[in-house]
Structures are given as C-alpha cells and as structure tokens.
Amino acid sequence: PSERGLDADGMLAAAARGDLGALVVGGVDVRDFADPDAVRAAIAAAPFVVSLEVRSSEVTRLADVVLPVAPPIEKNGTFINWEGRLRPFGQAVSARSLTDRDVLVRLAEEFGADLGITALSDLYAEANPLMDWEGAREAFAPVGAPPVPGVGEGQAVLAAHKPMLDA
C-alpha cells in the first residue's frame, strides 16, 4: 500500500463514526483495550461484523457472522507476545478445521482481492523483516491497571494475566 493504514484504535473509531462498511475481527478480547466499553460500542455500530474465533466471546455475540477457525493445537503458527517476542508453535492434533489464514484468504477472494498468501511461509516472509526493525517505534500511552480491591483479614486477591499472554 502507498498509504499507512489504520491501527486498531483507528479502525474502531472509524467504525463508531460509521465510516467503515464492515469489520473483520479475529481473536480480539475487548478487555485488551484501554476502554472496553468504547470497543463494544464501536463493534455494535459497525454495519456488518465478521468474527473469526475458536470460542464464544463478547465479539462473537456482537457479530453478524461467526466463522470458526482452528485453535492453536490444530495448526502451525507463531504468537507475537506483548513484548514483540516470537513464540512459534507446532500442530499437535490433526484436524480438518480451517486456519485463520485460510479463512481470511477465502474471504478476500470472495471480494476479489488477492492477499498474495498461499502458505504460512508467505506470512513469515512478509512479517520477518518487521521483526528486525531498528528505527523509531510508535509511542503508546501507558494504560494503568485497575485498583486492587481491599482485602480483609484472611482474604486474598487473585490477580492473573489472561491465558497465553506469553505463549
């Protein structure tokens, strides 16, 4: 592309304004954003929402169409954790489920677009050069944690990250 696209916040803001015709959302938890209520409102405001997901979620409940995708145990791939570290994983179970990549490629083909992706190696070839970036990085506003509730005598608070944060 000749122009920079929108980041997640930009896409959600555009959806909330009615500037997008549709949203395709994959594996997003609204609680990962600084303002989950704004994310819910933006998704609800989008005229058409497609969700690619392995389980029921707030997004799937708001979606017009939910397309199931293979969970990590049924495909090869790589997670990029919040620190930007690559965490590759292999397929543990043989299944016939479609991967996120397969579903996205088929959706694009239906709309007459060629993503240029025929194999997982195509994604690696495009993404790997980005991992070695040494230039300036985007500045992100810090997001504080919610206050820890008070605890009384003999009580405890369990504070844990979501599963697979560091997968």
Located regions from the model:
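Short, hydrophobic alpha-helical segments
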Residues: F111-L115
